[in-house]
Design a protein with these regions (language model features):
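N-terminal Lys/Arg-rich, disordered targeting/topogenic segments
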Residues: 1-18
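Hydrophobic membrane-insertion alpha-helices, especially the h-region
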Residues: 20-34
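N-terminal carbohydrate-binding accessory modules
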Residues: 38-98
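Substrate-binding cleft and catalytic face of glycoside hydrolase catalytic domains
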Residues: 94-266
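Glycoside hydrolase catalytic-domain groove-lining segments
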Residues: 263-307, 330
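Aromatic/acidic polysaccharide-binding cleft in carbohydrate-active enzymes
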Residues: 301-394, 398-402
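Carbohydrate-binding surface patches
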Residues: 388-430, 464-470
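C-terminal beta-strand-rich structural cap/linker in extracellular carbohydrate-active enzymes
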Residues: 449-474
């Protein structure tokens, strides 16, 4: 057989070329296959890179009173005749400080008549106020939407004349903060103006105009107890809205007591980030910085219906998010109290409520039970270190002098399980009972002894669970 050297050389060159190109082909194939699995890959690496919790509580390091930003609730516009009714005792058990209500002008028929000739009837709205007061809370009222009697179109339109809107706000404040005699009510001008009505902070449909006439009405209110007015309750924290409203307030000596926004997000760090940014922006307005309050007037893990609102997923997010707000957020309003009715007739349909619709027994969901558990934490906040990526925790001393730790393991993928070490430091040597209570009612008690000044226990925390631990001297 005759050999041809040029063929051998050519074959070698082809092999070398193939070996050089092969990695690029493999990379392209991997990319094509990987696109559909991108989220899985991200979650895998996120899971691998997360930090497990190693909780350490200094039982003698009291930081001060325990802040409770979670003691604020909101109810959306589910039904025109919604009342808390038989839910009042259950809501009262959450110890709410404020309950936010919107749709007051299009649901409760407060404004009647025609443009330029209007009257007011608060009788239907009074029932809602009665429920709020009976729950132990004060009203936080979103002044929304445009009363049909004065609107130039639908409930999201501008009024026929702005004087009617100004008078409407004035009379609302005079009724709630005057006739009803309720002190320290918050009035929030509109609800999500960037979504409901497509308001801007400039142009023909200008939220600044809406706010201006509202605060004029507030200034004209007579015979009233102390109250606060602000807004805008936008869908998220936006610097352009923040700057526009504060610049207007400073330039016009307008009353602006608080700035508000909503935040629906799975990122537990977002609330801290929001507050850091807002406080940083606020430094540019020294006239307002000493007094302006910052509120999150709706929050949850998803602004749309989501099955997690019916399960421990939403419960773990609510507690973990609340823990991350401690000492950072003054008021955050969990949305919402009760479900509306599912058009398909389901009891659980991923709605935001802590209770099902009345037609399904107004049954409490896990998020309600979790917030009740969270609120059992003691009043003296203790130093706690060692929170992880998924497991968040807070510690306090209760009235009995016992140390408590609330734990929440929120994992959006539902996979993270930890056997969380909890170390109690600066304790007296001796005998203790460790009571572990879990969302759903399961309870464990361990009797332990230590000759040292610290004690470590472990808490098994599957994904999306909440537990309350109490260390009791014997």
């Amino acid at each position: 057989m005759v050999e041809y050297p040029y063929r051998t050389s050519y074959t070698k060159r082809r092999i070398v070329l193939i070996l050089k190109v092969l990695p690029f082909f493999l990379l392209i194939i991997a990319a094509l296959v990987g696109i559909s699995q991108l989220q899985v890959v991200r979650e895998f690496f996120g899971q691998a890179s997360g930090e497990p919790a190693n909780i350490q509580v200094d039982t003698q390091a009291v930081l001060g009173p325990m802040p409770r930003p979670w003691r604020n609730l909101a109810q959306g516009g589910e039904e025109h005749d919604w009342r808390m009714g038989k839910l009042v005792p259950s809501v009262r058990a959450l110890n709410p400080e404020y309950i936010r209500i919107d749709h007051i002008y299009d649901f409760y028929e407060i404004v009647q008549g025609t443009p330029g000739n209007i009257t007011f009837d608060f009788s239907k709205f009074d029932g809602v106020l009665d429920d709020i007061v009976a729950s132990g809370a004060k009203p936080y009222i979103a002044l929304s939407y445009m009363p049909p009697a004065i609107s130039s179109g639908d409930i999201l339109a501008v009024p026929v004349n702005w004087a009617d809107w100004q008078l409407t706000v004035q009379k609302t404040i005079e009724h709630v903060s005057g006739t009803r005699g309720i002190s320290d009510v918050y009035y929030e001008v509109w609800n999500e103006p960037d979504l409901f009505g497509d308001w801007k902070y400039y142009g023909d449909k200008n939220y600044i105009t809406l706010y201006d006439y509202a605060q004029r009405g507030a200034k004209n209110a007579r015979g009233v107890r102390p109250f606060k007015i602000g807004g805008p309750g936008i869908t998220a924290l936006y610097k352009n809205w923040f700057d526009a409203l504060l610049k207007y307030a400073v330039a016009n000596n307008a009353r602006l007591d608080f700035f508000s926004w909503h935040r629906y997000n799975l990122d537990l760090d977002i609330y801290r980030k929001d507050m850091f940014e807002a406080n940083n922006w606020l430094t540019q307005f020294p006239q307002l910085e000493p007094t302006l309050e910052l509120h999150i007037t709706e929050w949850g893990h998803d602004s749309n219906n989501h099955p997690g609102y019916d399960t421990n997923y939403g419960a773990a997010h609510a507690v973990a998010g609340s823990i991350e707000m401690i000492g950072v957020v003054d008021r955050a309003f969990a949305f919402e109290i009760q479900d509306g009715k599912d058009p398909e007739g389901k009891a659980n349909w991923g709605r935001w409520g802590m209770f099902t619709h009345n037609d399904f027994g107004a049954a409490p969901k896990p998020r309600y039970s979790a917030l009740r558990m969270l609120d059992r934490i003691g009043d003296q906040r203790l130093q706690l270190l060692g929170k992880g990526t998924w497991v968040k925790a807070a510690a306090a001393r209760n009235d009995a002098g016992n140390t408590q730790v609330i734990l929440s393991n929120f994992d959006r993928s539902g996979r993270n399980t930890e056997n969380v070490p909890v170390t109690f430091k600066n304790i007296q040597p001796g005998n203790y009972s460790v009571v572990k209570e879990f969302l759903g009612g399961r309870k464990q008690t361990e009797n332990v002894s230590t000759s040292a000044a610290e004690l470590q226990v472990h808490v098994a925390m599957p994904a999306n669970t909440v537990s309350l631990i109490e260390l009791i001297p014997q």
